[in-house]
From Swiss-Prot:
This is Uncharacterized protein R625. It comes from Acanthamoeba polyphaga mimivirus. It comes from the Viruses.
Length: 186
């Protein structure tokens, strides 16, 4: 009875869905997850993970290392998007990215999209440095806020000395509140 009550509570708050998503993201390369609490970034800057966690404390951020990852060319349709970088954006470009993000999310029946930042459209690795990782995540958060989306996972992937960011994003769910227009009859 007690366990059933806890499971109902977990499901009602969407926590089970979050745990499943995090497990799904770990399935790719679980043996390569890095404990980066005391690891310095490769370019001698401040610890990137620590800086990310300090600047975005509500985000779930992890890091893996795998030199055998390759990426196919980006599909123009679907819910996966590659971006080389987001740091050279003016306000108009940010609005365009927000519109594109809304579209990518709509391409998945679960209303989610996955972004890889630091990849070219042909799947080649561009890579990001420590400061660029922080700046790109800041821009990405700004874009998600424009369309009322939320980030459910951030994964730094180290590949042959280059780092890319994998970000899972979803539309925030509305509460079950119902609002009526006063001008309409019911």
């Amino acid at each position: 009875m007690f366990i059933t009550s806890i499971l109902r509570l977990i499901i009602s708050y969407g926590l089970l869905e979050q745990l499943i998503l995090e497990s799904f993201l770990d399935l790719e390369y679980p043996e390569n997850i890095i404990d980066s609490k005391n690891q310095n970034s490769m370019d001698g800057e401040l610890n990137v993970m620590e800086s990310l966690r300090n600047s975005h404390p509500k985000l779930y951020i992890r890091e893996i290392s795998n030199d055998n990852i390759t990426f196919p060319c980006e599909d123009n349709n679907g819910w996966i998007e590659y971006k080389r970088t987001l740091t050279e954006c003016d306000d108009l470009k940010i609005q365009q990215y927000a519109t594109q993000m809304r579209w990518r999310i709509s391409q998945n029946k679960r209303q989610r999209a996955v972004y890889y930042i630091g990849l070219d459209d042909d799947g080649s690795i561009y890579g990001l440095s420590g400061k660029a990782i922080l700046d790109n995540l800041d821009y990405f958060v700004k874009i998600t806020n424009i369309i009322n989306a939320s980030i459910f996972s951030v994964l730094l992937i180290n590949i042959n000395g280059s780092t890319i960011i994998k970000i899972g994003v979803t539309i925030k769910k509305l509460k079950d509140d119902i609002y009526f227009n006063e001008d309409e009859e019911y």
